[in-house]
Amino acid sequence: MAQAQPGAAVAATKLPALSHLPNPSPLMKRLGAPLLALPAYQTGTAFADAPPAFTEVGLRYTHYSEDSIDQDVVIFGATDRYDIDVTQLWIEAPVGASWSVALDVQNDYQTGASPWFVGAQQDGAPGVIMSGASIQDNRVEVGVTTRYFWADGNAGVAVSHSDEDDYEATALAFDASWNSADDARTWSTSFSSSRDTLNPTQGVIPVFVTEEDLDTQSGYFGVSQILSRTAIARIGLSYTLSEGYLSDPYKFRDQRPDSHERLSLSAGYRRFLIDSDASLQIDYRYYADSWGTDSHTVEVAWAQNLPGSLLTPYLRYYTQREADFFGVIADTDAQYYADDYRLSSYGAVTLGARWAVDLGESWTLELEAERYMTDADWGVFDGGAAPALVDFWRGTVGIIWRFD
């Protein structure tokens, strides 16, 4: 789980931590960061070396709904795409003066159809053959985190296990943060390892894989620095290596390398504006991998304090270069090939807002709404236009209870 850094008050708010599961299941991979967010514990102002001051219990529900695919690009199959319901329950509590323990339980239920492969229509334009609307999947993840706090920092160990109809994953993670002598700077590091096992289920789509494994290791190092009474900046570098089965067994033309290296550089800036009683939040991320893909993400948010609540509208832009082996219509004569739109060149814009409302001293209501839109022409990289790019809506409601 994420820990607030010294001087975090200048940020006015704190985003949820990313899931401690380093290699999400195929169901969650398609969602990206939005639904990989797990609870942000103890969201009040805190220092990296401060244990939680109270017990926190939270319940959150998220609904994710993809727009139907344009009938003009469908050769065969249903036009409805995925709907996913995510329910999260968590509890974190102090244990003694220097420890805390947290339990996370998450359930995801998915229904709908997805692209099976891309072929040529009668006029030669690319068209999509869909899987049919009969896909259903349910995933349950349970995670436990224990954390130790000392005078200048903290360290935590997390273990998680997730299971669904065709996928099982176990992950172990370690993280630590420590402060400089003047508490103006905080260093953070984390390491994680996961073992995933895939057992594809036979259905409407023929599957030619019985059982495959995937191992993933990931490391991160970052630093945050208080720049002034009202400003803080951070920078971080992460590296991830996955080895094993990385193709998508539910796609007809998909043969990917059995190794995938990823490198990302992230930076952020928070400035509290006293006169406005709000903070400006700017985040940037550069990503590159061994498949030839690289991407840029920029997010700008405005966290506005209101009477009894905090409202944070945000705008995010994403652009991606296509993988070396991507083709709008896959070239099956090549060693590696894929027509998965997620490996294509495109751009995406996200508009959203988060609203946290205090309901008395012990309760907080969380609301969030987001619209995600993609287009091949919105990206800055050249490449073929995949016909199955996805747009979606996402809505979240949550309630948090804190008590001594």
Segments and roles (model prediction):
Residues 68-76, 114-120, 160, 167-175, ...:
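Outer-membrane beta-barrel translocator domains and adjoining extracellular loop/strand segments
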Residues 57-61, 103-105, 157, 187-191, ...:
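Membrane-embedded beta-strand positions of outer-membrane beta-barrel proteins
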Residues 70-71, 108-142, 186-246, 314-356:
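Outer-membrane beta-barrel translocator/channel fold
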Residues 51-57, 87, 97-101, 140, ...:
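Outer-envelope beta-barrel architecture signal
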Residues 89-93, 144-148, 174-178, 221-225, ...:
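Residues on the lipid-exposed face of transmembrane beta-strands in outer-membrane beta-barrel proteins
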Residues 81, 136-138, 161-171, 259, ...:
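Solvent-exposed loop/turn segments connecting transmembrane beta-strands
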